């Protein structure tokens, strides 16, 4: 579903464990890592798309997770020119994303990267909360920074305050 500005509606999924770590997944056959994400189909709500993508990409069902929060608004990023398919109609110039923060309620053994037979990812691991902001491909970095900042009070109430106070202290020097 591409809007009149050329942005494809998409959902992003951040899965956290009880230790405040987040699931970080490697794209199949590539060296790039990212959060699970995927398009919103016509007639589908963002929450419905999130649950569909959650199963397709990491094999988790609604009973395996709890929604903690979602972004207040859609966050956008533009694709680099080399990734824009000019021959497709309408032309997609980027993604507009609704993000969801999920708590894994089940054992991590429920995660199955091959649940649908055409895996998006070939590996995953738990990483520290802020790690993905530094590691994601550059054109997604601003969106990752915004979503992580918005979700920090929910995902890491104590660590979030500590992270921000450390940053402030560092700037005064």
Curated annotation (Swiss-Prot):
<dbReference type="GO" id="GO:0034353">
    <property type="term" value="F:mRNA 5'-diphosphatase activity"/>
</dbReference>
<comment type="function">
    <text>Accelerates the degradation of transcripts by removing pyrophosphate from the 5'-end of triphosphorylated RNA, leading to a more labile monophosphorylated state that can stimulate subsequent ribonuclease cleavage.</text>
</comment>
<dbReference type="InterPro" id="IPR015797">
    <property type="entry name" value="NUDIX_hydrolase-like_dom_sf"/>
</dbReference>
<dbReference type="InterPro" id="IPR020084">
    <property type="entry name" value="NUDIX_hydrolase_CS"/>
</dbReference>
<dbReference type="InterPro" id="IPR000086">
    <property type="entry name" value="NUDIX_hydrolase_dom"/>
</dbReference>
<dbReference type="Pfam" id="PF00293">
    <property type="entry name" value="NUDIX"/>
</dbReference>
<keyword id="KW-0378">Hydrolase</keyword>
<dbReference type="GO" id="GO:0006402">
    <property type="term" value="P:mRNA catabolic process"/>
</dbReference>
<comment type="similarity">
    <text>Belongs to the Nudix hydrolase family. RppH subfamily.</text>
</comment>
<feature type="short sequence motif" description="Nudix box">
    <location>
        <begin position="38"/>
        <end position="59"/>
    </location>
</feature>
<dbReference type="InterPro" id="IPR020476">
    <property type="entry name" value="Nudix_hydrolase"/>
</dbReference>
<protein>
    <recommendedName>
        <fullName>RNA pyrophosphohydrolase</fullName>
        <ecNumber>3.6.1.-</ecNumber>
    </recommendedName>
</protein>
<feature type="domain" description="Nudix hydrolase">
    <location>
        <begin position="6"/>
        <end position="149"/>
    </location>
</feature>
<dbReference type="GO" id="GO:0005737">
    <property type="term" value="C:cytoplasm"/>
</dbReference>
<dbReference type="InterPro" id="IPR022927">
    <property type="entry name" value="RppH"/>
</dbReference>
